[in-house]
């Protein structure tokens, strides 16, 4: 067979033309040690801080320690089958979670994967869990209220949209109950809610989800779960994931409320990771950046102005401000608010609601201590009605506590002191409230008016509770339209004052309480 050199060269040219090199540069490394969910990797010269590292078995780790000759990373999920010598790869991606309206009514894990058995989630895209908080120029002052439905909170420590209000207290003082009631009260307010459960028992979380469903609040709530059985990495990242889901609504000119339950457990998870990564421990064995852990999270809760929203949505939403309100929860040990993490979070937030064990055990629930509970910015967000009528409540309670301490030692008291003590007792009784019974603005206003205008003076302390419940039932039955309008407007003027007095007079005359 005669080979023609021209044909051969043509054939070679054709082959060369068809030759296609598809090569992809990948940074790979090798696991050198595995211990308690933390892996050390040799190689990965191009890895970024916080980057996702692909592991065998469709799992990921997050790079946290970038050292001279190795990388320390935390595994997202089970790690028992990882071993030395396994190959890992850089992904070039930062951890992202699904965001959007499709998440409302769903229970998801830290990675945004559904765990409620209701099928796939129809999300609107993905968002990185670590985002820089809006700057000063993009923010607007807090001047709209978030009604929790609790008399003690809405009257004395009001919360505004875009505020960070800490709920702090020992275990079993009603911290979660307060936060869950605040979520339930947003059923008809248009505020979307995110509940982040960190390091809690699965049975407790399922109970919370059931209660939200029973009260019709789950449909506008996202529940993010990193239970006690999850790895420390997932517990540490859960609040950031929940925050990214809340920012979706904030940046589109809507209002959202996020509850972190609780950040003490997140700090403990972060401490565990840091110690395993051999970072130097500081006070209470926490790492040096534990303040930054919480500050970068809570600074993302803000009220953003209309320009920011318009810019973010490329002009699709105009003239609307957005907000993300945060209710972080911190658990104290034996009422010690001067411990490391509590003082950090108190200094970051715009006020705190302090729940006291002695109040709770005495039957004062919610167990809010009005003496050291404050709201630094919420006052400007209070409705006119509550602002005008709640002024005397805090003063009455402060005077009552002071006098009650002295009254223990005094044998005879003058009439003025006796009157103040009696009024203080009645106000304390009035502020008691059962769980899952949030109050409307009008109901709150009417209760406060009864205390402010002296209608409780001739009511015995034991009868204050029944007096109030009968008064509210009477008002809802006979003045339904007025109560509805008042809840909507939250206004206060001479006409409204006269109407409230008319309701109280009429009730006192006609009703057997």
Swiss-Prot record:
PROSITE patterns: ATPASE_ALPHA_BETA. SUPFAM superfamilies: C-terminal domain of alpha and beta subunits of F1 ATP synthase, N-terminal domain of alpha and beta subunits of F1 ATP synthase, P-loop containing nucleoside triphosphate hydrolases. GO terms for cellular component: plasma membrane; proton-transporting ATP synthase complex. It catalyses: ATP + H2O + 4 H(+)(in) = ADP + phosphate + 5 H(+)(out). Keywords: ATP synthesis, ATP-binding, Cell inner membrane, Cell membrane, CF(1), Hydrogen ion transport, Ion transport, Membrane, Nucleotide-binding, Translocase, Transport. The record marks 373 as: Required for activity. One of its GO terms (molecular function) is proton-transporting ATP synthase activity, rotational mechanism. It is a peripheral membrane protein. ATP binds at residues 169-176. It is found in: Cell inner membrane. Pfam families: ATP-synt_ab (PF00006), ATP-synt_ab_C (PF00306), ATP-synt_ab_N (PF02874). Gene3D superfamilies: 2.40.30.20, ATP synthase alpha/beta chain, C-terminal domain (1.20.150.20), P-loop containing nucleotide triphosphate hydrolases (3.40.50.300). CDD domains: ATP-synt_F1_alpha_C (cd18113), ATP-synt_F1_alpha_N (cd18116), F1-ATPase_alpha_CD (cd01132). InterPro entries: ATP_synth_asu-like_sf, ATP_synth_asu_C, ATP_synth_asu_C_sf, ATP_synth_F1_a_nt-bd_dom, ATP_synth_F1_asu, ATPase_a/bsu_AS, ATPase_F1/V1/A1_a/bsu_N, ATPase_F1/V1/A1_a/bsu_N_sf. The keyword Hydrolase does not apply. Its main location: membrane. Its EC number is 7.1.2.2. PANTHER family: ATP SYNTHASE SUBUNIT ALPHA, MITOCHONDRIAL (PTHR48082:SF2). Belongs to the ATPase alpha/beta chains family. Produces ATP from ADP in the presence of a proton gradient across the membrane. The alpha chain is a regulatory subunit. F-type ATPases have 2 components, CF(1) - the catalytic core - and CF(0) - the membrane proton channel. CF(1) has five subunits: alpha(3), beta(3), gamma(1), delta(1), epsilon(1). CF(0) has three main subunits: a(1), b(2) and c(9-12). The alpha and beta chains form an alternating ring which encloses part of the gamma chain. CF(1) is attached to CF(0) by a central stalk formed by the gamma and epsilon chains, while a peripheral stalk is formed by the delta and b chains. This is ATP synthase subunit alpha. It comes from Glaesserella parasuis serovar 5 (strain SH0165) (Haemophilus parasuis). The lineage of its organism: Bacteria, Pseudomonadati, Pseudomonadota, Gammaproteobacteria, Pasteurellales. The gene is atpA.
């Amino acid at each position: 067979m005669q080979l023609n050199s021209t044909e051969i060269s043509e054939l070679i040219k054709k082959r060369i033309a068809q030759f296609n090199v598809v090569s992809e540069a990948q940074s790979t490394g090798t696991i050198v040690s595995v211990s308690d969910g933390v892996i050390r990797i040799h190689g990965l010269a191009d890895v970024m801080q916080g980057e996702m590292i692909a592991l065998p078995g469709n799992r990921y780790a997050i790079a946290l320690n970038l050292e001279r000759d190795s990388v320390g990373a935390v595994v997202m999920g089970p790690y028992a089958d990882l071993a030395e010598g396994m190959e890992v790869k850089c992904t070039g991606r930062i951890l992202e979670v699904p965001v959007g309206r499709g998440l409302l009514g769903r229970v998801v894990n830290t990675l945004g994967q559904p765990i409620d058995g209701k099928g796939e989630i129809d999300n609107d895209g993905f968002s990185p869990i670590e985002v820089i908080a809006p700057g000063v120029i993009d923010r607007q002052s807090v001047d709209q209220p978030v009604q929790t439905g609790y008399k003690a909170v809405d009257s004395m420590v009001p919360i505004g949209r875009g505020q960070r209000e800490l709920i702090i207290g020992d275990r079993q003082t009603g911290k979660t109950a307060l936060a869950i009631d605040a979520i339930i009260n947003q059923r008809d307010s248009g505020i979307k809610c995110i509940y982040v459960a960190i390091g809690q028992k699965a049975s407790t979380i399922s109970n919370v989800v059931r209660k939200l469903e029973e009260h019709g609040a789950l449909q506008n709530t996202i529940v993010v779960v990193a239970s006690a059985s999850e790895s420390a990495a997932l517990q540490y990242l859960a609040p950031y994931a929940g925050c990214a889901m809340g920012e979706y609504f904030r940046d589109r000119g809507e209002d959202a409320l996020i509850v972190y339950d609780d950040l003490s457990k997140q700090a403990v998870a972060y401490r565990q990771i840091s110690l395993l990564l051999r970072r130097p421990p500081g006070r209470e064995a926490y790492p040096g950046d534990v303040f930054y852990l919480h500050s970068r999270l809570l600074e993302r809760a803000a009220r953003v102005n209309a320009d920011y929203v318009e810019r973010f949505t490329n002009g699709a939403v105009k003239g609307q401000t957005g907000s993300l309100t945060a209710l972080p929860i911190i658990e104290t040990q034996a009422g010690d608010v001067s411990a490391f993490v509590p003082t950090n979070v108190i200094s970051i937030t715009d006020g705190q609601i302090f729940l006291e064990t002695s109040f709770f055990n005495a039957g004062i629930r919610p167990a809010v201590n009005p003496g050291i509970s404050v709201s630094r910015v919420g006052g400007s967000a209070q409705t006119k009605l509550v602002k005008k009528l709640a002024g005397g409540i805090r003063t009455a309670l402060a005077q009552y506590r002071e006098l009650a301490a002295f009254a223990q030692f005094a044998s005879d008291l003058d009439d003025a002191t006796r009157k103040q003590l009696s009024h203080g007792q009645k106000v304390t009784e009035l502020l008691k409230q059962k769980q899952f019974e949030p109050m409307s603005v009008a109901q709150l206003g009417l209760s406060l008016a009864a205390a402010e205008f002296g209608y409780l003076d001739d009511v015995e302390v034991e009868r204050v509770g029944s007096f109030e419940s009968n008064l509210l039932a009477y008002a809802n039955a006979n003045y339904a339209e007025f109560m509805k309008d008042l809840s909507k407007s939250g206004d206060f003027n001479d006409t409204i004052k006269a109407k409230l007095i008319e309701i109280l007079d009429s009730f006192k005359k006609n009703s057997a309480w």
